[in-house]
Amino acid sequence: MNGIFAIEKPSGITSNQFMLKLQHALTKSQVFSKEIQRATAERKQQYEKQTGKKASKRKLRKVSKVKMGHGGTLDPLASGVLVIGIGAGTKKLANYLSGTVKVYESEALFGVSTTSGDVEGEILSQNSVKHLNFDDLKTVEEKFVGQLKQTPPIYAALKMDGKPLHEYAREGKPLPRAIEPRQVTIYDLKVFSDSLKRDHDYPLLRPTTEEAVDTVKNLNANMLNDVLYFSKEYTEKHGLDSEVAKVEEPFPLSEQEEQEIQKEGDSYRAPKLHFKANVSSGTYIRSLVSDIGKSMRSSCYMVKLIRLQQQDWSLEKNNVFQLTDFTERDEKVWSKVLEKVLDEGATVDVIEELKKAEKEIPADVKECIVSSDQPGDEATAETIETANAEEHSNTLKRKIEQV
């Protein structure tokens, strides 16, 4: 089997770790066993012909599992559509890494900005939220839609003077100069009606240790004073002379608000931002969240992110698999549907086809499904090792989703 399909990544796991789980589930299936055996035999023969020696298990690792890659990282906090290429399909993944349209749904909290732009970062600032109102918030739908200059977050995988931005952040050092803005496109932005409501389950981030506060002080000049831009279309429509937004500084947290937060503690709930955005490749959702906060003279950080769609693969179109389809269903069921998707693409309704395939296979011939969490072959050991190394790298670098 070769081609492209999509699977839903859950929150709380890196894209690479999740892909390796999927890879192991497919590799141990009978569906792919013949192809893997053929590739292994060819590699053995090639190695022995070139070296005159027998190939070790280590030399055969690369061909002893399903060849796989993904078409765009989702960071651990994010869930949603992850495009997967298998076999020769991995060559088509480049088409998904740039120039694609993606749709995201995000939730964020007003009143705090963080180093990473999300719930896992250190607090940079606390700001007032008492002035916020829904009518003003709805204006961001126009202000940010169109061609937009956007400053990437400092934890993005970018470099300055040969040094990754995240290294400056991790060392608590100021950047040599401001981060250059990038041109992106926001095709559509919808703010949902539950925005500014407080009936949610997200506790507000609170300041931690004094040491952490000192560490981020050096970054404030670079991260809090980034230039805010409105879209080219908005500025032209309203006859503005520059795309640089003329918005006053965020309101500081009032003494009354501070007392309220202290009094309510973990039960305090900040007003929520809830929106859906249709964006180009290169758009940083965290930066959009932060910019919306600044445009409202407050601050904002992300608590939830779902990639609803990438090109034609969409959760709303039901053409996306789940990992449990491969780990809990009989492979006679999922293999039939997977083959159809690889042949026909995103037009296939995966959920409907799985239901049909289940009905077509008699219960007495269904195979026993072994949990993918059970210890397996040597490829599994490599999977765990690779995933752990990737997770360690993620902890250090805090790679932020670039969509």
Curated annotation (Swiss-Prot):
Pfam families in alphabetical order: TruB_N (PF01509)
Keywords: Isomerase, Mitochondrion, Nucleus, tRNA processing
Reactions the enzyme catalyzes: uridine(55) in tRNA = pseudouridine(55) in tRNA; a uridine in mRNA = a pseudouridine in mRNA
GO biological process: mRNA pseudouridine synthesis; tRNA modification
Annotated compartments: Nucleus; Mitochondrion
Gene Ontology molecular function: pseudouridine synthase activity; RNA binding; tRNA pseudouridine(55) synthase activity
Active-site residues, record numbering mapped to chain: 75
Source species, domain of life: Eukaryota
The keyword tRNA processing is assigned to this record: yes
Matching InterPro entries: PsdUridine_synth_cat_dom_sf, PsdUridine_synth_N, tRNA_psdUridine_synth_TruB
EC number(s) per entry: 5.4.99.25
One GO term describing the cellular component: mitochondrion
Family: Belongs to the pseudouridine synthase TruB family.
Note: Present with 3990 molecules/cell in log phase SD medium.
Family annotation (PANTHER family): PSEUDOURIDYLATE SYNTHASE TRUB1, TRNA-PSEUDOURIDINE SYNTHASE
Free-text function comment from the UniProt entry: Responsible for synthesis of pseudouridine from uracil-55 in the psi GC loop of transfer RNAs. Also catalyzes pseudouridylation of mRNAs with the consensus sequence 5'-GGUUCRA-3'.
Protein name: tRNA pseudouridine synthase 4
Lineage, opening ranks: Eukaryota, Fungi, Dikarya, Ascomycota, Saccharomycotina
